[in-house]
Amino acid sequence: MGQKIHPIGFRLGITADHKSCWYADSKRYPETLQEDRQIRQYITKNLSNAGISDIRIERKADQVDLAIHTARPGVVVGRGGSGIEQLRLGLQQDLGGNRQIRINVIEVQRVDADAMLIAEYITQQLERRVSFRRVVRQAIQRAQRAEVKGIKIQVSGRLNGAEIARTEWVREGRVPLHTLRADIDYAYRTAQTIYGILGVKVWVFKGEIIPGQEEIPMPVPSQTPRRQRRRQQFEDRSGEE
């Protein structure tokens, strides 16, 4: 069922690509897979404040090509490229061996329409003990300003310190999880609070991808009156809770 399966794994080979692109024989496959996991953990840990959205890995012989999608490329690059060089040396030392590592930094253009960055923002606010209803409302408002087709946010755990854990979700627009041609961006993060762990899931529907046609990037909205009208309607509806 489209509602149960991982949205990205459900669309692999159809509208979504693998995050790791390489081939290895059966003897080296476990070792190479573990290296990919090690690379992602190292980058996520050392660039926790850079707004990392995605990490793509390609391998060619002894060369590893990394594509880091980030909302703050200046933090990753550093002054005069020192950040990338330090990251490359750290990865080589962590992995061992003499393999060559190339790093390409790609800036995320629509930050408020990226599921991973939205989930990261929500977890940061929840760890600061902000009300989950307020955080979810703000995240949806920002996504609507980015002109996404639909968004769904689910938060699970001891919400606001309640004794009994529960799950609450909010959806705005369309989120067709069972449609294979739907471009669904999905992310899952956990927030470490004083009451326990809260799970945050975000689904973002960016439109439909028609086979044989190039995906047309959605323009940044420039109509101020239309954006204000949407925000007022959402605030009025959420204020009735």
From Swiss-Prot:
Protein origin, superkingdom: Bacteria
| Example of a GO MF term | structural constituent of ribosome
**Span of domain KH type-2:** 39-109
Keywords linked to the UniProt accession: Ribonucleoprotein, Ribosomal protein, RNA-binding, rRNA-binding
Region annotation (Disordered) ranges? 214-241
The biological process GO terms on file are: translation
Q: Which Gene3D superfamilies match?
A: 3.30.300.20, Ribosomal protein S3, C-terminal domain
Q: Pfam family of this protein, just one?
A: KH_2
Residue ranges with Basic and acidic residues bias: 232-241
> What would be one Gene Ontology cellular-component term for the protein?
cytosolic small ribosomal subunit
Regarding protein family, the annotation reads:
Belongs to the universal ribosomal protein uS3 family.
Q: What binding partners and quaternary form does the record give?
A: Part of the 30S ribosomal subunit. Forms a tight complex with proteins S10 and S14.
This molecule's function is given as: Binds the lower part of the 30S subunit head. Binds mRNA in the 70S ribosome, positioning it for translation.
Full protein name = Small ribosomal subunit protein uS3
